[in-house]
């Protein structure tokens, strides 16, 4: 099978950075669906950044934005000390892993549905486990549940939400590929 990857143009990069920034602001404020925000899509957005932007300066840009949102807009029932603790390092590691998996997918074949789903499953499970377990073990809060119960607490919701985001991403990528191929075909036919 021919390896297919995609290198965006400058205009595509600007558009993608703007879209990712918008959706980080739209989804990062809450982990759940509220009247003001969609469920958190950060891991999938970092995955997209790794796929198409690749450069680590953009990873740093999105990390700063995410950190700023967490710092400046904690949920009313929580304070910054609850959110920003040593366990937060796991979230940063999960974002970095999401970016790396996106880069890897683009290098291997971004349009292979089988690879896309395999890497997406790895993304969802590993990002959840890393961020949840580091919070459990390294946060300063006293968690009354066992580690097993704590991990299972939000996994189903996290898995469903991120699977929906991954499916939306796959449809967008396949649509883009279809339009890109038809655009190239129409340019060739017009010559």
Report the location of each language-model feature:
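Hydrophobic transmembrane alpha-helices
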Residues: 2-52, 57-61
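Short helix-perturbing small/polar motifs within transmembrane alpha-helices
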Residues: 2-3, 75-128, 174, 178
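Residue-level signature of transmembrane alpha-helical entry/exit and packing/kink sites
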Residues: 12-17, 43, 58-59, 83, ...
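Hydrophobic core of alpha-helical transmembrane segments in multi-pass integral membrane proteins
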Residues: 18-28, 94-101, 170-175
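Aromatic-anchored segments of alpha-helical transmembrane domains
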Residues: 21-30, 64-76, 124-133
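Alpha-helical membrane segments and adjacent membrane-interface helices in multi-pass membrane proteins
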Residues: 36-99
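Membrane-embedded alpha-helical hairpins and interfacial helices in multi-pass inner-membrane proteins
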Residues: 108-191
């Amino acid at each position: 099978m021919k390896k297919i990857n995609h290198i965006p143009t400058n205009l595509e990069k600007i558009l993608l950075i703007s879209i990712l920034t918008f959706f980080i602001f739209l989804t990062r404020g809450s982990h759940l669906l509220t009247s003001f925000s969609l469920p958190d899509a950060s891991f999938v957005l970092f995955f997209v950044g790794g796929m198409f932007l690749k450069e680590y300066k953009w990873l740093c840009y999105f990390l700063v934005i995410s950190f700023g949102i967490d710092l400046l807009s904690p949920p009313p029932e929580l304070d910054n000390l609850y959110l920003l603790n040593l366990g937060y390092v796991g979230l940063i590691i999960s974002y970095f892993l999401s970016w790396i998996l996106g880069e890897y997918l683009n290098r291997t074949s971004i349009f292979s549905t089988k690879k896309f789903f395999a890497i997406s499953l790895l993304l969802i499970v590993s990002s959840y486990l890393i961020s949840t377990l580091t919070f459990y073990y390294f946060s300063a809060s006293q968690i009354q549940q066992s580690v097993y119960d704590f991990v299972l607490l939000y996994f189903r919701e996290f898995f469903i939400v991120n699977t929906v985001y991954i499916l939306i991403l796959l449809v967008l990528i396949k649509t883009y590929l279809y339009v890109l191929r038809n655009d190239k075909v129409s340019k060739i036919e017009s010559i």
